[in-house]
A protein has these predicted regions:
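Accessory, non-ATPase domains that flank or precede helicase/AAA+ motor cores in DNA-metabolism machines
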Residues: 1-222
Length: 222
């Protein structure tokens, strides 16, 4: 029988991973339940290792919490980079990217990922005429082919949101996801209304005033 070894990050202020063994292959970024001291906690698989420093005393992974990883490749690598760059415990960094309920060893939340459904978002059949300045700005942004921060400057009511909507439309047509960040919670209703007026389907809202269950449902569908 094959035995595989994995470095696991746990959500504690510890600047190291812990090696566990398993009889199955597990993808990195997957949540697992591991024995830790006298209790069982949630950990995240960081990597598969070939030759552990020592096999003595290695504990076995209790169970696999999810059918698939919590993070795509890009997100996973970004979180690894952030933990290294900011010299912060790797487990705490990883777990800061998942909802509170998914950080706990709870059967109800462990099975939650297996029951999620996707948001369906489609553009409404309505055309909006852009001003000359808006067209020029949108044209420049559409030429960007890689990550690049951009600043759109304008007073309130100058049409910045319409540019965001048009950019969102472009990516929705490519079956991609859109993340809109607002500077404060009080602005969410008006921004949400603009997007609901433009796009049909369900739009997820995620903020600190929601309950853990509400945030979990949105995170699972994103």
């Amino acid at each position: 029988m094959n035995i595989f070894y994995y470095d696991i990050a746990v959500g504690l202020p510890l600047r190291q991973c812990f090696t566990y063994k398993s009889k199955v292959i597990i993808k990195k970024g997957t949540r697992v339940i591991v024995p830790f001291g006298k209790k069982s906690i949630v950990g995240i698989v960081i990597k598969k290792i070939s030759n552990p420093d020592s096999l003595k005393g290695l504990k076995e992974i209790i169970s696999i919490a999810d059918d698939y990883p919590c993070f795509d490749k890009s997100s996973f690598e970004t979180i690894l980079w952030a933990a290294d760059y900011y010299h912060h415990p790797i487990g705490e960094v990883f777990f800061s990217f998942v909802p509170t309920l998914l950080r706990k060893n709870n059967n109800k939340t462990i099975s939650a990922l297996k029951k999620f459904s996707e948001y369906q978002l489609n553009e409404r059949d309505k055309k909006f005429k852009l001003t000359k300045e808006q067209k020029a700005t949108l044209s420049k942004l559409n030429k960007v082919k890689q990550f690049s921060p951009s600043l759109i400057y304008g007073v309130t009511g100058s049409g910045k949101t319409e540019i965001y909507l048009q950019l969102a439309e472009k990516f929705i047509q490519k079956n991609k996801s859109i993340l809109i960040l607002v500077p404060e919670i009080n602005l969410i209703p008006q921004v949400l209304k603009r997007f609901k007026d433009r796009f049909s389907g369900e739009i997820g809202v995620y903020h600190s005033r929601q309950t853990p269950n509400q945030r979990l449902k949105v995170w699972l569908k994103s």
